[in-house]
Amino acid sequence: MDAILALCEGNSLFYQYHPPMATRESILADLTALPPNKRMEDKAYIGFFEEGKLAAVLDWISGYPTKETAWIGLFMVSAERQGQGVGSGIIRGLTESLRTVGYREIQLGVDKGNPQSFAFWKKNGFEVVREDDYIVMRRKI
């Protein structure tokens, strides 16, 4: 929990567009947050470590919003590892793994006005599907 909170606190730019700043309570809530009609066994919350230090976290839901789609709820790379290919490498590995087990698409939401997040997902092959309260993006796999 401390490692996740520290990673979040180091990413203040994200929280400028997605307030409020993370707390222990909000992280605990995120660990069990689910979209409608999904169960905990459909959710993965994964930490990626380098040299014993948390480098990134990934939260995704299998089979949402359709059976062949995986929804990324959160992906955050530690500030000190950004710009070094760590995030793109994780997404590349996730994409290959999901394709192998039969998924055809990955979707996610990006906060409007967050140029860093939007550019990251565009660079990794995601395209805009629609804009609501946030920008929905997808990548066909």
For each feature predicted by the language model, list its residue ranges.
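Terminal substrate-recognition subdomain of acyl/acetyltransferases
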Residues: Y134-I141
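Conserved beta-strand-loop-alpha-helix junction that forms the acyl-donor binding cleft
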Residues: L108-S117
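Conserved acetyl-CoA-binding loop of GNAT-fold acetyltransferases
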Residues: K122-E131
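Acetyl-CoA-dependent GNAT
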Residues: D2-E80, I91-G93, S97, R130-Y134
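Short glycine-rich hinge loops at helix-strand junctions in the catalytic core
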Residues: G85, G102, G125
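Residues forming the Rossmann-fold NAD(P)(H) cofactor-binding site
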Residues: S88
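Conserved GNAT acetyl-CoA-binding A-motif
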Residues: L98-G109
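Active-site acidic-Proline motif in GNAT/NAT acetyltransferases
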Residues: S78-E80, Q84, K112-G113
